[in-house]
């Protein structure tokens, strides 16, 4: 995704012999890697080095599912962020990142259309916010497919906001990838986030199957839908762009697309320090940062 690669352990260089000892130790402990080590447990219960170039040289932390949930819980409970507040910041970050990777001038068709596919949870809410901001940005024409709408005020409000801004909702998802390729310049995958577990149920199974076969680029919000949060999914969709929110998740090491952005400039410094997130500095007033 993203020479010699440098491995840091809490900011200290780990030599080859010490690394070998650590790998053996972690394997004996069942494959969970120490926090802040720049390591991730693979399917063989061993740790492997993150291969993310300069990002990991700065010690950027990649989170497991449990760690990502813990960070979110602290944002909600300790720092008193609301769900809709974080959703707004996340969705805005996604829209801004898309404009940087896919400016309207790069679209091949005359109509700069973007299909935003939203799931039933918070990731889908991020997608609704993203679509609304894309509509406000000059030139983008988003459309939304939202097959499973939660019966909750937050999501009803987000849906109404998009409708009031004349963003069309696509009732039927095209089963043929050629239809999507011909109608849209970009697909935003906002189906499942890092909290998703278990088998993919319909209609999302067919949706992801179709997205695996499209040729237009896909931008995934936080996690490529259908991926294991920590192990990825080589048989799943392979997005051209990944927008990691708060901090990258461990599955991001398997991302091979062209654009990896970090979004959501809302993490308090004390929380960043507690979890050794080592987030890269955001330039100026930007809410996104491109990762190597």
Swiss-Prot record:
Localization (cell): Mitochondrion; Secreted
Cofactor(s) the protein needs: K(+)
TM region(s), chain numbering: none
EC numbers, comma separated: 5.1.99.6
CC cofactor note: Binds 1 potassium ion per subunit.
Domain YjeF N-terminal: 68-279
Gene Ontology CC terms: extracellular region; mitochondrion
Signal peptide: none
Binding site for K(+): 123, 189, 225
Transit peptide feature range: 1-52
Catalytic activity: (6R)-NADHX = (6S)-NADHX; (6R)-NADPHX = (6S)-NADPHX
Ligand binding ((6S)-NADPHX): 122-126, 193-199, 222
Superkingdom, natural source: Eukaryota
GO MF entry, a single one: metal ion binding
HAMAP family: NADHX_epimerase
Listed NCBIfam families: yjeF_nterm
Role, per record: Catalyzes the epimerization of the S- and R-forms of NAD(P)HX, a damaged form of NAD(P)H that is a result of enzymatic or heat-dependent hydration. This is a prerequisite for the S-specific NAD(P)H-hydrate dehydratase to allow the repair of both epimers of NAD(P)HX.
Family affiliation: Belongs to the NnrE/AIBP family.
Protein name (database record): NAD(P)H-hydrate epimerase
Organism, scientific name: Xenopus tropicalis (Western clawed frog)
Lineage summary: Eukaryota, Metazoa, Chordata, Craniata, Vertebrata
């Amino acid at each position: 995704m993203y020479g010699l690669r440098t491995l840091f352990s809490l900011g200290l260089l780990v030599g080859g012999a010490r690394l070998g000892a650590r790998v053996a130790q972690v394997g004996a402990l069942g494959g969970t890697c120490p926090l802040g080590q720049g390591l991730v447990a693979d399917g063989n219960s061993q740790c492997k080095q993150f291969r993310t170039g300069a990002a990991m040289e700065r010690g950027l932390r990649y989170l497991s599912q449990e760690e990502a949930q813990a960070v979110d819980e602290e944002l909600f409970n300790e720092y008193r962020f609301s769900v809709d507040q974080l959703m707004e910041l996340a969705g805005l970050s996604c829209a801004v990142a898309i404009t940087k990777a896919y400016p309207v001038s790069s679209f091949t068709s005359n109509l700069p259309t973007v299909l935003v596919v939203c799931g039933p949870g918070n990731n889908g809410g991020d997608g609704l916010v993203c679509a609304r901001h894309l509509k406000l940005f000059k030139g983008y024409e988003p459309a939304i497919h939202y097959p499973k709408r939660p019966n909750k005020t937050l999501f009803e409000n987000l849906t109404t906001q998009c409708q009031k801004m004349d963003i069309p909702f696509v009732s039927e998802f095209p089963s043929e990838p050629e239809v999507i390729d011909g109608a849209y310049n970009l697909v935003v995958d906002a189906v499942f986030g890092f909290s998703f577990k278990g088998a993919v149920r319909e209609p999302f199974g067919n949706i992801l199957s179709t997205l695996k076969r499209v040729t237009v680029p896909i931008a995934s919000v936080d996690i490529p839908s259908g991926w294991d949060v920590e192990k990825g999914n080589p048989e799943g969709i392979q997005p051209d762009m990944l927008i990691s929110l708060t901090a990258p998740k461990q599955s991001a090491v398997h991302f091979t697309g062209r654009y990896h952005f970090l979004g959501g400039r809302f993490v308090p410094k004390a929380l960043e320090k507690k979890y050794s997130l080592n987030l890269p500095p955001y330039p100026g007033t930007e809410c996104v940062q491109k990762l190597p």
